[in-house]
Amino acid sequence: MPSTPRRRLIQHPASSIQYLTLSLLTLLTLCATSPAQPTNLTSAFDLPPGFHIYRAATAELSGGSYDLCFDGEGRLLVGDGTAVRRLIDRDNDGIYDGYEVIATGLGPRGPQGLLVWGDRLYAVGGDGLQLFEGYRSGALVHRGRLGAKFNTGGDHDLHTVLRGHDGYLYLMAGNGAGIEGRRHITEATSPCLFEREASVFRVSPDGQKWECIARGGRNPPNLGMNYLGELFSWDSDMEWHVGLPWYRPTRLNHWVIGGDQGWHDVGALPPYYLDTVPPVLETGRASPNWGVFYEHTQLPGKYRDAFLVCDYR
């Protein structure tokens, strides 16, 4: 059996972006103290001093983990390809040993976005952004799709959904999600009059109001909002262009309201164009995946308010 490659957690000296590279869709928990359980995976990773990593759930429990989130009670939800599972830790030892399926009909390869907000569960799957109600009571009811249809399940389709500080939903759509014209926009106040390529949408909780607040990305599977309400993502490159003069590396995007990231189908505008938002940081060859802002206190201070992202390679 081949040896497990070592992976790295690196802080770039010029930014607050860290890379947690994961070669398998295994659900892992990262902490700054020694794990209490024996399934210790620290030796398979290159980690900063004082960090340890252990397996919180096996692949059989997580079901592949296309996305994950915590609810208001700290319970972990994962997408297993077609459904939402809520993992169970029966003996409270920090290791999950069971699960229950709480929502279905979210395939293929989904849900790729999950959010619990009060009594509602939002999930990216099927034909777009789905709404379930009754989460607190344990009797979830599917209320249907919010807004117009999206493509889901593919690597370039509809991705992350998160709750904004302003009480709205924010949705990241990849360049293959079915973005065109004003297909999903309902409001005349939309900062971008037309959606184009990978776009970020601002959506009312009931799904009645849709705005495109930024556009023109390649395919960022992730979206994070910092404590100031600013949106960032780690965007993909075009692998066909590697070695060519116009190759654009993976990059950290700042989704400025009304801004355009400059990607056009199979090419990109130069970053010095007045109507193109330049990257915060170019990050070379990679395969961007999940990302989140770290807003807690368990990790050392220098990691707080940092954007943690996963490299699928």
Describe each PLM feature range:
Residues P13-A14, L20:
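Intrinsically disordered, low-complexity proline-rich regions
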Residues Y19-C31:
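Bacterial N-terminal signal peptides
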Residues A36-R313:
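Beta-propeller domains with acidic blade repeats across secreted/periplasmic ectodomains
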